[in-house]
């Protein structure tokens, strides 16, 4: 069984764009955050399915935290600009492989768990790396546009994602050092 994928590039919002408006920047960030919340929900469900309680708790915490951040982002934009952030279309992320839905938890082999943990941790690090880059580019664009207040708001998001990225990279590295040994993964859940 193979972990899913995320077919989305947050940086596509800035591809070839110069002098984006604050509204366009916030639309890109909002869309990215919505997808991020969906990813953390799927990761939490997937880890719960594999009986990986610690990893499930980490992702549930991120799901709640990022849901709050998304709400704060919308509130910030509404109170500062008296407008709603426009909606945009996006592909729903696929984290849990479709064939998993045909199985029960006890159908999983140790190799299935090993591969799933490896791919999902790599996916998480990749996602948060892209998130940090998006926020940094958004910050720079807002500064360039003279919207210092919004840039300072985005700088708080950069700090948050930087902390999450450290956590994700540490967990990935810890598992890489043991070559994603399933016994070690299970022991780490206590």
What are the language-model segments listed below?
Residues 2-190:
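Iron-associated oxidoreductase/ferritin-like identity signal
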């Amino acid at each position: 069984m193979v972990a899913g994928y995320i077919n989305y590039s947050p940086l596509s919002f800035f591809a070839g764009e110069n002098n984006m408006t604050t509204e366009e920047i916030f639309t890109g960030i909002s869309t990215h955050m919505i997808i991020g919340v969906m990813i953390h929900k799927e990761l939490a469900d997937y880890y719960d399915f594999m009986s990986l309680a610690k990893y499930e708790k980490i992702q549930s915490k991120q799901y709640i935290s990022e849901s709050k951040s998304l709400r704060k982002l919308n509130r910030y934009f509404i109170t500062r600009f008296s407008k709603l952030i426009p909606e945009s279309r996006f592909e729903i992320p696929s984290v849990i492989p479709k064939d998993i839905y045909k199985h029960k938890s006890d159908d999983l082999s140790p190799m299935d768990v090993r591969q799933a943990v490896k791919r999902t941790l790599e996916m998480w690090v990749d996602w948060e790396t892209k998130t940090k880059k998006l926020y940094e580019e958004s910050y720079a664009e807002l500064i360039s546009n003279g919207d210092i207040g919004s840039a300072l708001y985005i700088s708080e998001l950069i700090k948050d994602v930087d902390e999450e990225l450290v956590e994700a990279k540490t967990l990935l590295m810890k598992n890489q050092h043991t070559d994603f040994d399933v016994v070690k993964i299970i022991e780490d859940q206590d």
